[in-house]
Regions:
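Structural/interface elements that position substrates and couple domains in central-metabolism enzymes
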Residues: 1-167
Length: 167
């Protein structure tokens, strides 16, 4: 699989369906590999081959098989996650963090505007600190970033936790 899904989706949702309809047994008759998509459509600098690829498999052997496939086309290299769930969670955190950071800057921009403070100037000043992560007010962008926090919230509620800041 190569998509953005919540942690557990491949093994808890997809695999049972594959087993049911194929009559095959997971990790005996068939295996799964997962690598979240990490492309940035339209970005000429960060192309598919120049972005390190997180890869995983349902067994160490499958992880190596998936790795051997991707290292042929990904010049930036790969990162072997210890499990499919870790790889799924890595992608969700990437997009959820971006969504939340832009939402925070949007809200701060509204506050600063009401105080007659130029947000761009504030950001330029804040960027002088080595560990400040700059984000600009605006739309989140991307086809999946805005929906990924909902995937994580869905899974969180299924395991009995209601997130406080994800949405």
């Amino acid at each position: 699989y190569e998509s953005t899904v919540y942690p557990g989706c491949v093994e808890e949702d997809c695999v049972p369906l594959l087993e049911k309809f194929s009559k095959l047994n997971f990790n005996k008759d068939f295996f799964c590999g997962y690598s979240p998509e990490r492309i940035n459509p339209g970005d000429k600098k960060r192309t598919i081959s120049s972005i390190k690829k997180v890869i995983s498999g349902s067994t160490p052997e499958i992880t190596n098989l998936v790795n051997n496939l991707y290292i042929q086309i990904i010049s930036a290299g790969t990162f072997k996650a210890s499990s499919i769930k870790v790889a799924e969670a890595a992608k969700i955190i990437e997009n959820t963090q971006r969504d939340l950071n832009i939402a925070l800057i949007n809200e701060l921009s509204i506050v600063f505007n009401k105080m007659n403070i130029d947000t761009e100037e504030v950001l330029e000043a804040a960027k002088t600190k080595w560990n400040f992560s700059p984000f600009m007010p605006g739309l989140v962008g991307g086809h999946c970033i805005g929906v990924d926090p909902y995937y994580l919230t869905y899974k969180s509620k299924k395991i009995g936790y209601s997130p406080k800041i994800i949405l």
